[in-house]
Regions:
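Cysteine-nucleophile protease catalytic domains, especially the papain-like/related folds used
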Residues: 2-141, 230-231, 238-267
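Solvent-exposed loop/turn segments at secondary-structure junctions
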Residues: 40, 149-152, 205-206
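Generic domain-boundary/flexible-linker signal
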Residues: 44, 154-156, 209-211
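A generic "cationic amphipathic patch" detector
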Residues: 46, 51, 158, 199-202, ...
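Short, charged/polar low-complexity linear motifs in solvent-exposed/disordered segments
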Residues: 68-69, 162, 215-219
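Active-site-adjacent substructure of cysteine-protease-like catalytic cores
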Residues: 124-201
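Noncatalytic regulatory segments and standalone regulatory/sensor domains
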Residues: 167-181, 188-274
Length: 274
């Protein structure tokens, strides 16, 4: 798998009106990035759901402290929770597990949606392969990536850097905007003669261009790999009848299909996934 053809753009459409609903829903509520996507996916499939309902089902536990320290530059806190959320006794017991997010999506959908968890292995080529297989097998799917943002490029690089990367030229990566565990979605990829960029859809309009940013496939792979003793991965969410076929294609491509440990096992302890 050598990546997309030069000049090609591959997109994952997601469910109907997903991009519009995303634009309306931003920004996420504080510390509910995983629940943000769960609620958005469920709502797009006709099951109107709030971030809090998904978070409670996922076992999310909030960390105490000043939320400004967990936000990307320019973002402001949003703590308008509709219910009382559980708060951890200490930072090490706060967070949201990817398994919890998957469970909440499947259970709250009444079994109409399925989640295929992909735990790696991660490389630039495998990220591109995941996008292409998902788009071909389940074009209405949503790829929810759980990663470490500190390995990504800054979300608003000069256009020349993106073009140089696509041409295969060596560039100096812009510093990341922030560094934390996070959930976002993969919306597609762009291919050039010397490289590829992944289209990411984020939870804050301050990141990139109204929440969208382009990242080298290798940077996304590093962010999924994390390098901090925790694991990352992608929750491939689609209609339940498509999940089996998607899992089969991904398994044939040597992906590891299992849930991963991001440091927050079912919200009981671990990493703060913003």
């Amino acid at each position: 798998m050598d990546g997309p053809l030069a000049g090609s753009v591959g997109t994952i459409s997601g469910p109907p009106d997903f991009a519009l609903l995303h634009d309306i829903a931003m920004p996420q509520k504080d510390q509910l990035c995983g629940a943000f996507w769960g609620a958005l996916i469920l709502s797009a499939y006709g099951r109107a759901t709030g971030q809090e309902e998904v978070a409670l089902m996922a076992g999310t536990v909030l960390a105490e402290g000043d939320p400004v320290g967990w936000l990307p530059p320019g973002a402001t806190p949003r703590a308008d929770y509709e219910v009382t959320m559980p708060v951890a006794a200490n930072d090490t017991s706060a967070g949201t597990s990817a398994k919890g997010v998957a469970r909440s999506i499947e259970d709250l959908s009444g079994g109409t949606l399925g989640v295929v968890p992909v735990a790696g292995p991660w490389s630039a080529n495998s990220v591109l392969s995941l996008v292409e297989i998902s788009a071909a097998t389940a074009p209405g799917c949503v790829l929810v990536a759980n990663l470490r943002t500190g390995h990504l490029w800054g979300s608003r690089p000069p256009a020349r850097l993106l073009l140089d990367h696509l041409l295969g030229r060596t560039v100096s990566p812009p510093a990341p905007d922030w560094d934390c565990g996070h959930f976002l979605t993969i919306a597609g990829c762009v291919g050039g003669p010397g490289g590829a960029l992944i289209i990411l859809r984020d939870t804050y309009p301050q990141l990139g261009w109204d929440g969208y940013h382009l990242q080298p496939a290798a940077a996304v792979a590093a962010a999924l790999d994390r390098g901090d003793g925790r694991e990352g991965g992608v929750l491939c969410t689609c209609e339940a009848p498509e999940a089996g076929a998607l899992a089969g294609r991904l398994g044939d491509a040597a992906f590891v299909l299992r849930h991963w440990d991001n440091g927050s096992p079912d919200g009981e302890s671990g990493d703060h996934n913003g």
